Amino acid sequence: MSISVMANSHLNQPYASASPTPQEKGRTCRYAGQAVRALPIRVITVGKKRSEGVRLLVDEYKIKLKPYCSFEDSLVRSNPRNAQDVRAQVEDEEVAMMKLIGSDDWVVVLDERGRDIDSEQMAELLGDAGNSGASRISFCIGGAYGHGTQVRKRANVTIRLSSMVLNHQIALVVLMEQLYRSWTILKGQNYHH
């Protein structure tokens, strides 16, 4: 996999720049079995009150992640000022999201136009973030109309969980499982086959 550097206003961090080549499919994570600095993880989701089923699944994965890293789940209310204009709604959500992103966070934006990565690459993303000098990794899940310009510009990397558009609650559950899977890959544990 080729590694390139993406310039950010305050961080200059490596990230995988392209989808895996056919030769890279089926490979293992380059950090597997190595010591990786465990950054605290914050997931910032734009949305409304979560369903009971989603809350239960998120809580289950919070417990599973505890041995690996600290975890914080933040919910930004969608359309906080009840804007009638879509652009105003996205801007309002963006302001709230940006308040939760620290100046030295390593930011991953989830977007259907983002880079397609596999589970090993997600584990490598956690390893890259841990080696970056950042104090935390923040994953950002946008609202119904996506992310604003500031959030996109702030991203160290933009990935997608699927080629399909996912409801923010489904995206959160998929992300939680992938974070757990990534840590088991990094630790060489029997979960990912």
UniProtKB/Swiss-Prot annotation:
Q: Which GO terms describe its molecular function?
A: methyltransferase activity
Q: Record's Pfam families?
A: SPOUT_MTase
Q: Which GO terms describe its biological process?
A: methylation; rRNA processing
Write out the entry's keywords from A to Z: Methyltransferase, S-adenosyl-L-methionine, Transferase
- Record EC number: 2.1.1.-
Q: Which residues cross the membrane?
A: none
CDD domains linked: RlmH-like
Binding positions for S-adenosyl-L-methionine? 110, 142, 161-166
Q: Which HAMAP family match?
A: 23SrRNA_methyltr_H (MF_00658)
Its family remark reads:
Belongs to the RNA methyltransferase RlmH family.
State what protein this is by name.
Putative RNA methyltransferase At5g10620
